[in-house]
């Protein structure tokens, strides 16, 4: 028996496996994107309460991961849409017909390593993302009690200062919280990308 038939039905929350499978496929296709439950339900023909219940079940069973947004005001974090990721990057790659992690699949891989690192820290930091109303975005923000570290992920082997625009915007917005940032890339060298951004091969930190 599969995870679907055995484990989830044992939780007595999946009354329609066909609907659940459709929603899982929709989740796989949205890795790294903002979670819009209304849109997702409309795309797969599932009513909103069921979408909400199934997503909660995916998260409770360690399949889906909802990444919260960074905001200094913690109340605002609760109302901002989370980003959706998947706990099994290899499975997500297989279902997408890919063999190497690129784009959002590379983001997903990096996130899994960040979460594994977070879980063994004595003072557990938070892992979040940042996005402005105008669409400027940073893939991940590591928040400790005193400081934050913004991180951007690029699969390209060659990166330039223009790839750090989101990171620089974050550093400008929160000068009292962050004074540096990381850009993880697909190349082989570690070097200063800008005065405040260090470029590091992603495989050196994952």
Where are the language model's segments positioned?
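Accessory nucleic acid-recognition modules appended to NTPase machines
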Residues: 1-148
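Short glycine-/polar-rich loops that comprise or flank the Walker A/P-loop
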Residues: 146, 176-180
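Switch/connector loops and helix/strand junctions flanking conserved nucleotide-binding motifs
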Residues: 94, 160-161, 190-194
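Domain-level recognition of nuclease-like catalytic cores that cleave nucleotide substrates
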Residues: 186-206
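Short beta-strand-loop-alpha-helix junction that forms the active-site gateway
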Residues: 153-161
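Arginine/glycine-rich "motif VI" loop of SF2 helicases in the C-terminal RecA-like domain
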Residues: 119-122, 169-177
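Short beta-strand/turn micro-motifs composed of small residues
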Residues: 131, 154, 183-185
